[in-house]
Design a protein with these regions (language model features):
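Conserved short "hinge" loops at termini or chain/domain junctions
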Residues: 1-165, 174, 198-212, 218-243, ...
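Short polybasic amphipathic segments
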Residues: 85-93, 267-276
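Beta-rich globular "head" domains
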Residues: 86-89, 172-201, 244-247, 251
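A structural signal for short, hydrophobic beta-strand segments that form beta-sheets
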Residues: 204-212, 266-270, 283
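Acidic-leaning, charged glycine-interspersed low-complexity segments
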Residues: 259-264, 273
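Protein-protein interaction interfaces in oligomeric scaffolds
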Residues: 271-289
Length: 321
């Protein structure tokens, strides 16, 4: 599942454009594609500005240089796509020679959020490899005179946030169930949404605890007539990111809705019949949108929010020669 399963057209209607007349002149509602495209555009924009990947993205053969000076720091790498969910393959190669695999267990994530990993040999595998001159090699030290080898390490990994959904059961007579994720969320606290599919006499639900591996759900009273079925959605998307995307995605529908209040660029109009007249004024003009005040408010909120998110997610790259 993806972020678009959380930020849907209906989500935008129910939150950021609530109270706005979202119908065309003929009375038909705005089409879903208007909101879907606005959401997709907002997701891409926020991803680009923060330098992170929201939905799972598999990267094959990302190359990183080897420097002798990094030996004492256990070869730190900052991967190109963040946050890092898992590393599937770790290899070495000189130029275009065939890849030689290293144990994946050597890749230790030190900051999944910032894509930082280190190469730390494990005790059970270190004997199979030689460390001559600081660069790990399979056979001898033929490259040891070199202080720098470009593109020496090749890394396959998966980046992005985690979104899982499913159904769990609280057995009859019991009051608690564990939701276990298929993978650890590392540094991030998950968000959990619950829905009772079949109560079977059970009481209200609450989340007892959450962890990077899942959550514990309890019911106020045990089901009495059968097993209680519960649908869950659990993810680690930052709530501030969801808000930023919602604010940005709402601007396009608000722009269109403002034009349809009285017509594009029309600030007021009057109607007169048989000596009776009526005037209608709006906040729209040739240069201002009908919902301009809300748009300006959203833009200001977005600017403040993005400043905080950049400080949290952006990395500082330091290069040495």
């Amino acid at each position: 599942m993806s972020l678009s399963s959380i930020i849907t057209p209906q989500f935008i209607r129910d939150t950021y454009v609530l109270g706005v007349d979202l119908t065309l002149d003929d009375g038909s509602p705005y089409p879903d594609i208007l909101f879907s495209q606005a959401i997709e555009s907002a997701i891409s924009t926020i991803e680009l500005q923060l330098g992170i990947q929201f939905d799972p993205f598999k990267v094959k053969g990302e190359r990183h240089d080897a420097r002798i000076s990094n030996k004492s720091a256990f070869y730190p790498f900052t991967l190109d796509h963040r946050p890092v969910k898992s590393v599937e393959r770790l290899s070495i190669s000189l130029g275009n020679y065939p890849l030689v695999d290293l144990p994946v267990s050597w890749a230790v994530s030190t900051s999944a959020q910032h894509g930082q990993i280190n190469l730390i040999p494990t005790g059970e595998t270190i004997g199979s490899f030689l460390f001559r001159g600081g660069i790990p090699l399979l056979f001898g030290d033929i490259f040891s005179p070199y202080q720098y080898v470009p593109g020496y390490f090749s890394i396959d990994y998966t980046s992005g946030f985690t979104y899982e959904e499913g159904v769990v059961v609280i057995p009859q007579g019991e009051t608690e169930v564990e939701i276990t994720l298929s993978e650890s969320l590392a540094e991030t606290k998950p968000t959990v949404a619950l829905e009772v599919l079949d109560a079977q006499g059970g009481g209200a639900l609450r989340i007892k605890s959450v962890s990077t591996d899942g959550a514990t759900v309890v019911t106020a009273s045990a089901p009495t007539t059968g097993d209680m079925q519960i649908s869950y959605k659990i993810h680690n998307y930052d709530p501030a990111i969801i808000k930023a995307i919602g604010l940005l995605a709402a601007i396009s529908p608000l722009d269109i809705a403002g034009d349809l209040i009285a017509g594009a660029g029309i600030g007021s109009f009057s109607v007169g019949v048989d000596g009776l007249s009526q005037s209608i004024g709006t906040t729209a003009s040739a240069t201002s949108a009908g919902y301009g005040a809300r748009i300006i408010s959203y833009q200001k909120q977005l600017k403040d929010l993005m400043g905080m998110l950049r400080a949290k997610y952006r990395t500082v790259n330091i290069f040495s020669v």
